[in-house]
Amino acid sequence: MTTTQSAMRMVEGDHIKNWQASSDSGIFGSLDMAVEDLGFLMKRNRLDSGDQTGKFPSRSESAPPSMEGSFAALRNLLKQQEGSSSEVLSRAIENYDSEEEIRSDPAYVAYYLSNINLNPRLPPPLISRENQHLLRHFGDNNQSPTTSWDNMGIRSSLHSSRTALSTHREEPEDEASSGEQQSYASLAGRRKSIADMIQEDFPLTLSSVFKRPHSAGNRPIAQDIHAISSDTSSEHARRLPESDINSVNLLRETDSLSSDAIASEDPFTTDLASQSFTNAQTERLNARQASHEDNNLSVFGASPPSSVASRMRRNQEDQQSQGRRMPPQYTPSSYQVQASSPQQMSYPRIGGTQDMMQSLPKIATGEVHSTFQSPHGLAPPPMYTSTAAYMTSLSPFYHQNFQSSGMFVPQYNYGGYPPASGIVPQYMSGYPSHEATVPMPYDISSTSSGYNNPRLLPGVSSSGQNIPSLVDPFQLQYFQQAQVDAYAPPFQSSTDSFGQKDQQAVGYMANHEPLNSPLSPGYGLQSPRHMGNYFAVPPGVRVMPQYPGSPLASPVMPSSPVGGMMSHFGRRSETRYHQQGPSRNTGIYPGGWQGNRGGASSIVDDLKRHSFLDELKSPNARKLELSDIAGRVVEFSVDQHGSRFIQQKLEHCSDEEKASVFSEVLPQASKLMTDVFGNYVIQKFIEHGTPAQREELVKQLAGQMVSLSLQMYGCRVIQKALEVIDVDQKTELIRELDGNVLKCVRDQNGNHVIQKCIESMPAGRIGFVIAAFRGQVATLSTHPYGCRVIQRILEHCSDDEETHCIIDEILESAFALAHDQYGNYVTQHVLERGKPDERRQIIEKLTGNVVQMSQHKYASNVVEKCLEHADSTEREFLIEEIMGKSEEDNHLLAMMKDQFANYVVQKVLEISKDQQREILVQRMKIHLQSLRKYTYGKHIVARFEQLFGEESEVSEEGTEG
């Protein structure tokens, strides 16, 4: 017979013991039968007796293993491993009478995990993997090697000697602890997970994850763990020898005081007394705990030691002495204060919060987690006092930290509420200020004594109402975070809250925080446009806004100044250009705040302006007029869509509307001239404005011609003015450029102004411009901007005597300019527009170097212009130089293969006539086949076939024949 998943009855006998029915018998009915069978087998087959292999029935070697064989193998294995964990298991099996007790012992768990691969049919332990991990965690505090009670002659678990963290449970007086009177067999009847024990301990947990039916009593999780690991042994204490009672008593005392012992190990931790209990209730609770310990000790047959109460008092005195040695900036607190009843909630004792506490809701699972301030700026690790408490609260063990990486753990959290919510900190006037504590979304202290009383807070009633809405945890990543040394001593920022920051802190932040951070707009003192509704903050601290940035939106601090338009995520909507200069936005606010212009009315104006701009962008918007933007013309002029709107209206509007718009534009004309969009509005006024308006704008140009000529957008306004205004006004304006002509010519913007002067004014009016070029023509001709100015002079001033000096300098440097990337354009311009004598002089300078210049990137263009604009005699000389004097000259073949000269050959084919063409065609026919193999030779072949198609075909046939 083989073992199956549910044990089967295999042997009967008179030694069967009737076990107490488990509370889970309805679900695991077949397991009770297995308990009886396994108990009989264990009593019939003691593993510590002599060799009894003959008592097991003989089986075939091919038959699967039986339960008897498994125990026999286990016995032999235990004999070979004396002193190991198997010895502990062997002694434990002697004293266990049921399978559940064996499978619940941690020693069996260790044996099961080490031998499951050898014997897959071993029944699994009743302790789930979650509870195994938790039991191991409870024993991690003891760094010494694991010891067992078996060394003293009694059986226990492998982890019984480790320090277990028990939870102190506070119960009403009329409640009786019935969990200790129940049989632990019901607990071992089924495997319980962490979630089951949490549901038993906290039946009102808000999370739906743990809403499962449970059958066990509502005992705290620490008691369940204690029942699994340690209390199971107390049921069989009567089996222990009398000599081992004292050691057991010592362990029991250590276990009962484990919570106090661990709490006292931290030199900076003390108990936080609950505000809901009186001193009398605390004394009765201590008395009940002492009697409970005495009852536990009396089970072993020993009298209750009188040292237990004294030891508890001694622990309390040690904790008080440790609290006196704490630094003054650390608030005495424990890690957790658990509310054991849905009707009671424990809060920290902080002055000035009694009235506020009356209005707070009674949270069933409410707990206060106080992040203790350690000297190194780190919070001590939380202890597993209650697993459900950490899962229902926002502990970093079970929830991600919604604060930024630079933020520490929140000071106070409530189960079921977002982290660092504004429920309590906003009214904790006695709590240390920001300089010594973690930054909170709201100020939890004040700099004046008037705010120490919650009744004096503006907008807040004495009962603590008008509590702000909670922050959405999933939106915290979009809020601005406070950046400050949260654990710095208070004296470091004892100056005015709006004073300068410590220079070392500024340097550190500048080197360790990215400047482009979307949540970090800058360092030092932040402007109110970057801060939310906050008051009396440390210098440079940025806060997490929960309300729109408006003075009317804060129910707590209605006088908090905030400028600009703040969206829900703290983004501001400000105009790119301001009307009143850099100092117009300064307002008078307490504490040195710089407010927005106009306060609330400015916000309305901004909303109206943005609504108009949105309508301009929309294709289906209503038709707007210039009168709709009255008073905002300048702001619309610097906007892309607003500038286009004004330009369109100025072309067809009435004189009255022009005058209205012009009255707003004229005071800011100088700034609009240099604006990327505003300059078009000025140009439109110069073009479509009245003569009086043009004259006013010209006066605005006077005195700043040089600066505007060198500016990207200002030079366009000047060019437009030179096109429209009369000659006298032009002459008056351009005289300001005298002495700065060459500077403007070499500038990427100013050269356009000089070109416009040459184009729009007679040569007699710009004599100072031409005079500035004397001796600089060759240099300016090789300049990227100067060559353009020289060409404009050749176009518009070639007939004047004053320009002869410029042409003479070009002819003298014709050969050099022909090889320059910019000068070749000047030479070509003279060949195209110059007089015949000027062209002849250039051709004479180039004769003898035509083949070499034809292979040059820039000079080849000049050679083409010479062939195109030369007379017949000059052209013949150039073609003869290209073709050579005899057929032995290979100039033509080399030019046809060259990447630049092939264009010169194509030009020769186009312009040659009569005898020269015949000679050229005959010489080119010889090389047509070879030219097809070259990239640039193909261009010659294609051009030749296009001009002389029939002759080329005949020549090819003759060559093949």
UniProtKB/Swiss-Prot annotation:
Biological processes annotated in GO: 3'-UTR-mediated mRNA destabilization; defense response to virus; drought recovery; post-transcriptional regulation of gene expression; regulation of translation; response to osmotic stress; response to salt stress
Record's compositionally biased regions (Polar residues): 331-344
Primary subcellular site in the record, as a coarse category: cytoplasm
Keywords: Cytoplasm, Phosphoprotein, Repeat, RNA-binding, Translation regulation
SUPFAM superfamilies for this protein: ARM repeat (SSF48371)
Pumilio repeat residues: 628-663, 664-699, 700-735, 736-771, 772-808, 809-844, 845-880, 881-922
Entry GO MF terms: mRNA binding; single-stranded RNA binding
SMART domains in the cross-refs: Pumilio
Domain PUM-HD: 608-948
Functional note: Sequence-specific RNA-binding protein that regulates translation and mRNA stability by binding the 3'-UTR of target mRNAs. Binds the APUM-binding elements (APBEs) in the 3'-UTR mRNA sequence of CLV1, PNH, WUS and FAS2.
Protein name stated in the entry: Pumilio homolog 5
Organism whose genome encodes this protein: Arabidopsis thaliana
Gene: APUM5
